[in-house]
């Protein structure tokens, strides 16, 4: 069953700063939120949406932390990591 998307959101100042610092563009953020590979609750009111991507022949997990207990949802932070086995459920 596909993970539920988030289509209405705002990017917090912190998330915008971290996206710029980490080289993650708005298009990447939108694609993860619109079609996440996985979605988990971190704590009540906060979810992490993530998807696997390949950038320059290297595989990453892009993780987006979102406060879902408000409307619109707030993107708290975004990062990418090569630690697929650590973060991806049922990693190969």
Per-range role (PLM):
Residues 1-92:
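Ribonuclease/tRNase effector modules and their secretory precursors
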């Amino acid at each position: 069953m596909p993970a539920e998307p988030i289509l209405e959101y705002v990017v917090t100042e912190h998330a915008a700063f971290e996206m710029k610092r980490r080289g993650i563009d708005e298009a990447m953020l939108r694609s993860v939120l619109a079609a996440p590979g996985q979605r988990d609750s971190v704590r009540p009111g906060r979810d992490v949406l993530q998807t696997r991507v390949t950038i320059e022949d290297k595989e990453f997990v892009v993780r987006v932390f979102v406060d879902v207990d408000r409307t619109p949802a707030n993107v708290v932070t975004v990062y990418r990591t090569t630690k697929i086995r650590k973060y991806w459920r049922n990693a190969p």
